[in-house]
Amino acid sequence: VLEKHNLPKALVTVVPNPDRALMQELMEQRDYIDVIIPRGGEGLINYVTDNAKVPVIQHFKGVCHLYVDKDANLDKAMALLLNGKTQRTGVCNALEGLVVHQAVAGDFLPKVAEAFKEKGVKVHVNEKGSQYFDGADVISEDAYGEEYLGLEIAIRVVDDFEAAVDHIAQFGSNHTEVICTEDAEKGKLFQRAVDASVVMVNASSRFSDGSQLGLGAEIGIATTKLHAY
């Protein structure tokens, strides 16, 4: 590809030896390396961040949520949920959490249970929402915030908008957060209240993509606010 575009092959170099001692030496070469973008598991990323002397563009997991507000169009919410969770599960912009206002839980979650059963999605849900799912795992508080990268999702039924924002602040990864609501002011409030690179109103989390947003190529998995929209 480089030769096709008249670029030198030396622009891309592979270090064939995975020895961590060599990686440590590489991370200290401030005179020769401008920036490191680690790609791999959380342990590797933590190691590079803690030990590098070269600037690091850090990326972590994508724990994205859909919040279904009391004023949501539930058909729209279902479309956002299924697209965000089941279209492609192993990506950083897939949904890992669903937060539902208690006012619409009785109408929405039985339909979610039926759809997820058909799609084979495993549900982890808090006590308040467990009545709507047969055989669902009742989740403990410390189990929220998991990046499943598969057909699993964590669900929480909340009392109000503020509780939803608090949940996202505690368990989100600042990647992408979505609200489904027909209340325009509530959508704007959500965008101001939630801290994430991309905050969406009535759109799928799967649109959080460098190409889709016109921000250029992606680097790593989730480079926090390097790409913010």
Q: Where are the model-predicted features located?
A:
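Short, surface-exposed amphipathic charged segments that create phosphate/polyanion-binding patches used
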Residues: M27-D31, N73, A136-A143, G214-E218
